[in-house]
Amino acid sequence: QAPKIIETITDNREDDGAGNYFYEFETENGIRQSVRGTPGAAGAVIKTGSFSFPLDDGTLAEFIFEADEYGYRVDSPLIPVAPPNPSHVEELLQIVAQLKAQGAQWNDQGERID
């Protein structure tokens, strides 16, 4: 059986020739993408945008992103997030920061060496 052909229902593209561009598309099965590009530092291109697609259960998977000289960052409610540190870990991190400010040092095994 031949695969079903999915039609593109929206396809917009703009490019000013100076490094700024925009494009967006949407397909009949609910896939969407929108991207804006601008010149960045040292020849880098800064891209921001979003994309989405329907999941099998009918809900929409939505993502926003930014890409630049520092890498690619994406955000979505679907991306797992680590739980917050327990309070005792936060207290220990504060103690370590105070010790570092006082000149304390540790080796690669975590042993204090000052």
Swiss-Prot record:
One of its GO terms (molecular function) is structural constituent of cuticle. Arthrodial membrane. It comes from the Eukaryota. It holds the Pfam family Chitin_bind_4. Keywords: Cuticle, Pyrrolidone carboxylic acid. Residues 18-83 form the Chitin-binding type R&R domain. The modification Pyrrolidone carboxylic acid is found at Q1. PROSITE patterns: CHIT_BIND_RR_1, CHIT_BIND_RR_2. This is Cuticle protein AMP5. It comes from Homarus americanus (American lobster).
